[in-house]
Regions:
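Active-site neighborhoods and metal-handling regions in enzymes and metal-associated proteins
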Residues: 1-402
Length: 402
């Protein structure tokens, strides 16, 4: 109502879920097949995937009164243009806007296929950016959303416990991904969007994807677990060492944690994203030519129905375009630091709820110091050091307390 828009047309599944409280599964996330219209001053109208429309009419009473309808778009180009689906969608939208006297007002659109956008223009409908309005609406979480985000984070504690116990020489990154995914689906996750499992020399630079690399003694290993419970997501990194940690890795972890803790300590209503980003290191301080080249490594972002929501915190965008932090935001803060050995690195992330008086960290798997996973090794004189160089001649190997 605060905008100039006559309505919002949404194909983004997360926006549709926010507006209509309907969902047909994560398989539909990237299909652009479903669409909804939220007219100014009225209730939403949903055009759903075939029989899903009838299902929602029966079981979603808030979508009653003929507002849950069947309607098919272009399925990201899978339907041939000559079938006329783009024109059909445009006519449907125009008819609803005209009935409410809104056809002359700008229509906010989030994501759309170009043939549908062109068809709307031919019908005289001016499409404008509606994604910013939706992001603004989703920025502050309701109490129910906060409960769901907390529950989703709680669920990730379990795969981290299992990963910690399972990591040892000989297992592969993809096996760790399978373990995390199995654990979450067994607990009721509706979608494990991604498990980044990164080990050894793959840690720096961060590749953002797992492989079948075998874990070896002394490897660093970090994970990001992204999943959805009742629509609400996590972004939750943890770093480990396998069997033992090198002094360089321990130092990198301390540095990574320090940058993260500084950001967490600042989180309260009234500060800005620029305040936080300014406390993080410049790209050149950790081996990158500019902020775009290291985007996402010293990073903050809202978490909700999608894993990246407003506000975004980065030296790339926040210093010149600050956003004020408000109570009710849930923000993931993630930091990275490469080790001096040239291949190890640490990566940690915490999800933070901004409260009226400060903040609450909702990701609870231990991360204040580097955890060493795997069975301890024993020598003839006692336990092998948990902090040791991979090459004994460099010092740090042998028995004794860590």
């Amino acid at each position: 109502e605060a905008s100039e828009l006559g309505g919002l047309l949404c194909f983004d599944m997360y926006n549709i879920r926010y507006i209509t409280s309907t969902n047909i599964g994560e398989w539909a996330r990237d299909k652009l097949s479903r669409f909804c219209l939220l007219p100014r001053g009225d209730e939403p109208i949903m055009w759903d995937f075939g029989s899903a429309a009838k299902h929602h009419e029966l079981y979603c009473p808030w979508m009653g009164g003929g507002r849950s309808r069947a309607g098919i778009s272009l399925l990201r180009g899978a339907v041939a243009p000559e079938a006329g689906r783009a024109e059909d969608v445009a006519r449907k939208i125009k008819r609803e806007l005209e009935m409410r006297g809104l056809a002359k007002a700008p229509l906010g659109v989030d994501v759309i296929e170009l043939p549908i956008y062109a068809a709307l223009q031919k019908e005289g409908i001016a499409g404008v950016d509606g994604q910013q309005l939706m992001q603004a609406a989703r920025r502050i979480k309701t109490p129910d959303e906060i409960v769901l985000l907390n529950t989703a984070a709680m669920m990730v504690d379990a795969p981290y416990e299992k990963l910690y116990r399972a990591m040892r020489p000989g297992v592969r990154e993809n096996e760790m991904v399978a373990l995390a995914a199995h654990t979450l689906y067994s607990m009721g996750s509706e979608d494990v969007e991604g498990v980044n499992a990164i080990a050894g020399e793959r840690c720096s630079p961060h590749p953002h994807i797992f492989s079948d690399r075998v874990l070896r003694p002394g490897d660093p290993a970090y994970y990001d677990i992204i999943h959805s419970y009742m629509g609400y997501r996590t972004c939750y990194y943890r770093s480990f060492a396998v069997g033992s940690a090198s002094p360089a890795m321990v130092d990198a972890y301390k540095r990574c944690r320090e940058y993260l803790d500084v950001a967490i300590a600042m989180m309260k209503p009234g500060i800005t994203t620029a305040d936080i980003a300014s406390m993080w290191p410049r790209a050149q301080e950790f081996g990158f030519p500019d902020e775009e080249a290291c985007f996402g490594l010293q990073y903050g972002h809202g978490v909700g129905l999608s894993v990246w929501e407003q506000p975004v915190i980065s030296r790339l965008v926040s210093l010149d375009h600050p956003v004020t932090i408000e109570a009710g935001m849930v923000i993931a803060l993630e930091t990275f630091w490469p080790a001096s050995d040239g291949w190890s690195a640490a990566r940690i992330e915490e999800e933070v709820l901004v409260t009226e008086t400060g903040h609450e960290v909702i990701t609870r798997f231990p991360a204040e110091t580097l955890l060493v996973a795997g069975a301890p090794y024993w020598t003839g004189t006692g336990p092998l050091n948990a902090i040791r160089e991979l090459e004994p001649g460099l010092g740090g190997a042998g028995a004794g307390a860590p």
